[in-house]
């Protein structure tokens, strides 16, 4: 066991404890979820390199934006109930601007993933692939209806495809 990896894991405990209460105090519980949910990337970096190298830090940062995107979509399912019960979320904060924020989060995520693919392979095809995927996501998400629980659930579940794409993308590039 790498003691530094274990200690890095323990550093996430305060975030894990505070996350369930974030909706009471901030409109950004999705950010806290992103910090917590992707912490394993930092642990892996420590385990294999005994440091958090730039590649893994950028991967962690990218995954935070991915979490912001998909969990904001998920939050739109509960937006009306959250408004009635004074519960905060990015869906409540963004309101009708949800498409723009979610697409911004996805774009940042994909650009960082594209950069990591390029740095790993030196292949500009990685950026071309990412730009095509961003374009496809823009077209695809334009059909997302912010006021529909079913639509939000559908686009939330689509993140399985995004995860699969990113896995193979990083594997190939």
Residue ranges and their predicted role:
Residues 115-173:
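Extended hydrophobic alpha-helices typical of membrane-associated regions
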Residues 29, 78, 159:
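Residue-level signal for inorganic ion chemistry
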Residues 16-20, 62-67, 74, 132-139:
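Alpha-helical transmembrane segments of multi-pass membrane proteins
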Residues 55-66, 122-129:
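Alpha-helical transmembrane segments
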Residues 64-112, 143-144, 150-156:
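Solvent-exposed interhelical
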Residues 13-16, 37-38, 63, 106-110, ...:
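Residue-level recognition of pore/gate-forming positions within transmembrane alpha-helices
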Residues 1-58, 115, 138-145, 150:
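Intramembrane alpha-helical segments
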Residues 32-46, 93, 156-170:
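Small-residue-rich segments of transmembrane alpha-helices in multi-pass membrane proteins
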């Amino acid at each position: 066991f790498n003691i530094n990896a274990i200690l890095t894991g323990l550093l996430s405990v305060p975030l894990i404890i505070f996350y369930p209460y974030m909706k009471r105090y901030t409109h950004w519980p999705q950010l806290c979820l992103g910090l917590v949910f992707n912490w394993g990337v930092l642990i892996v970096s420590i385990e294999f390199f005994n440091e958090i190298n730039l590649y893994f830090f950028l991967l962690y940062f990218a995954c935070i934006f991915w979490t912001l995107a998909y969990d904001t979509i998920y939050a739109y399912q509960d937006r009306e109930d959250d408004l009635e019960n004074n519960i905060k979320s990015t869906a409540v904060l963004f309101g009708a601007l949800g498409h723009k924020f979610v697409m911004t989060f996805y774009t940042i995520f994909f650009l960082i993933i594209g950069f990591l693919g390029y740095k790993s392979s030196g292949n500009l095809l990685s950026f071309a692939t990412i730009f095509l995927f961003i374009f496809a996501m823009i077209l695809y998400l334009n059909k997302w209806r912010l006021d529909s629980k079913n639509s939000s659930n559908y686009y939330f579940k689509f993140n399985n495809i995004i995860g699969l794409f990113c896995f193979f993308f990083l594997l190939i590039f």
